[in-house]
């Protein structure tokens, strides 16, 4: 009977025979399949890991059997905050805890039975990987795509450290609860904005979920509009606002500038300064994400000054509001509350004027296009023409011009943290900023560093690390103390997998350009606007440097859903609703666990765990095992054989070919739940056939072998065992995936239901080539139906070909 012993038996056999080793010399039908690598946390693999990895492995196994040369590597995204925070809390060094966790997770991943190419493993915290992280930084620096400037960061005055946006919860440090402030620090950036237009355009060329592409488009935020120049009343000060709806310019009733805008000090009246300063301090405690939340109430404070609308000379009040970001556009917006929901909410709260200038809609705010009204000589123009006409007018008077704007900002990559890749830069008093020569890489991360937070980069405390010599002049110099954002590690790891043992280069161009890009990439949708965008940028940058000959890293992308606890809530130790894969595997075996995950949930949606579901799957696997045993006995018995293809044989052959077709199509589209449902139907057909008095053993043998083949990707250990039970040659994964026969899917007979007034009264088998009239006659004359029609008036007979006949009668 199937159990974890079966799993271990075949895992050992696969290891001994190196069955899944990728042959890079076979260039035909290559298939690079990749799941997002995981962070090596201290806990075991959870249900989410399994839901990501196991179904994708099933897809890849099917593709292997279909003749593809599958490359499916695995590794660990091993730098990052969790290990550093854990070290601060426990005193265990990040390197020690991380390597221990990697060892544990490697064993757990191998127990899954996935056909990962472990010989191609990468671990980002090891020098043989982050050496090339540093090389990548140097290439970007060499091509003016890496630069340094001052930038505001989240600062916890209690922990004396910089916090990432995700570490700020409702304006407070998630670790200690202290209110977070903003602080300016000198930071390193990658110039992703040089590629914004191409990143937008090439989304049309990749097979990604539309929602994910829409998220990236929104994040990059391309806007075509107009820069409008406002003058501050009673002064010489001018400022620009960017708008995509310049046709509403006559409806501006106030303007809002960001709290960080340089204008604030110069436009704030004396009597408003105290309130303004309080507001600015409060704004420092909010992250950009929080400030732009659509559910958060908009707030603001008046400066006491007025701006002059350039189109009509009208004075409008100048406010500051934290929902306006200084990093987007000009850090100032014109407010048209009649035609913008955010402006309407703000104006209503602070009792500011609301004036309609676009016709349409029964209520305000009206945000759609329409005819301009209350707009002087522009009245009657429809929005597109109005935009063009007003922009031209502003250009003529020198107070505006057309412009394309983007929300995307350059990627801030420096972190004041220890557990990350050291930035390969040296600072020399004589020579300035000097890149570390490539021959001196890696700049190794020192082990003995005091990294308790005190507001400075931990590496500053290591004199041995910091003190070096300038590679240009040879004088004493200092190293950069910041480390790289861990998203840099994952921005190119898919390239290193294919050439992970190369000690001379990050990767061999010829080798990479044959195997890449990744054909199928799978991971969570939460990475849409960071990792997935950064990887696209790095690919394009390396292409332009001459290292790659392709434009996109991941041709196809799929997202897995979330497995929830039995209570329908997100799994959490504190809620007591977690599911341990290890416990499930020990009880049922990894294939039962794998198949339940694929059958019990839509892969893209996920859902709530159900203990009854995995129990049912265990029973299903046991049932298959019994059927295989019965069929083996039948084949070996030599009794009650026949060679003819009668009705029962045709029905079995139909089920066989229909299942092959359906499973191939459904699993190919990541619809694993319906693929396994088809396998269950196929199982029922097999069981039904072996109850026949006489059997076509040749057909039965071919059918059971095809059955084991199509279940193999979903239950690999179990399928290998049944393949061996049937006396077949190792391994089933060297077998060719079965192909369906279209002729077998053409039925000579079909079962239809006969209804009277919509209620089923009988079922009959009829030839598939009958006309509607012949079907009507057969139905009405059926022995079970005739008595029910006596004394009734048949009004009409409805035929639904291949499904049913409905006889409509009246007394």
Swiss-Prot record:
Catalytic activity of the protein: tRNA(Leu) + L-leucine + ATP = L-leucyl-tRNA(Leu) + AMP + diphosphate
GO molecular function list: aminoacyl-tRNA deacylase activity; ATP binding; leucine-tRNA ligase activity
Keywords, comma-separated and alphabetical: Aminoacyl-tRNA synthetase, ATP-binding, Cytoplasm, Ligase, Nucleotide-binding, Protein biosynthesis
Top-tier EC class: ligase
The EC number(s) this enzyme carries: 6.1.1.4
Subcellular location as annotated: Cytoplasm
Domain of life, source organism: Bacteria
Keyword Transmembrane: no
Residues noted as binding ATP in the record, renumbered to the chain: 573
Tagged with keyword ATP-binding: yes
GO biological process: leucyl-tRNA aminoacylation
Motif ('KMSKS' region): 570-574
GO cellular component annotations of the record: cytosol
Motif position, 'HIGH' region: 38-49
Family: Belongs to the class-I aminoacyl-tRNA synthetase family.
Protein known as: Leucine--tRNA ligase
Gene label: leuS
